[in-house]
Amino acid sequence: MLIHFVLHGKTDDSYLKEGVMKYTKRIKHYISFNELIIPSLKSTKNLNYEEIKQKEGELLLSKLKPSDTLVLLDEKGVQFSSLEMAEYMQKWMNQSLKNIFFVVGGAYGFSDEVYQRANFKLSLSKMTFSHQMIRLLFVEQLYRAFTILNNEPYHHE
C-alpha cells in the first residue's frame, strides 16, 4: 500500500515543516509514503469561497484513479482514538488497497464533488485547526498508529 498525503499549497511555518518532515521520515520505516502538494491557486481575488473549493477540488480529483481510496481529513468525519486509528490502518492494509490518499483540504474545505468521491471522512478532533496545523497533527497520528501496530513503545495508554 502506498499512502499519499495530499496538501493544498506549501506548509508555511518552519516549525510545522520540521515536524512534518520528522514524522514523514519515521512513517517511511513502516510503509511507502509520499507527500503530494497541489499548488495554491493563483488570482483568487475575484473568486468566492465556493469557486475556490471547486477549482481546488478539480485539481485533486484529476490526480485520482477510480481504484484509489480517498480519505478526507474533515471536521465532519469519524473520530477515532489512536488505537482505533491503528486498527483502521490495519484493516486497510488487510484489504490490500493499492493507493490511499489522505487529503487536507484548503482553507475553505472541500467541494461537493470531492465529498461525493470520498471513500471515508476522518476527523482528528471536534475542534477546528488551520489546514496548516492539521498536517503535523495527522502525520504524528499516522506514525503513532504504526508504532501501535508494531508494538513499539511510543504510545502509552
Residue positions per predicted region:
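N-terminal beta1-alpha1 ligand-phosphate binding loop
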Residues: M1-I27
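Rossmann-fold NAD(P)-binding glycine/threonine-rich loop
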Residues: G105
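Hydrophobic/aromatic beta-strand patches that form the interior of the parallel beta-sheet core
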Residues: V6, L36, V71, F120-L122
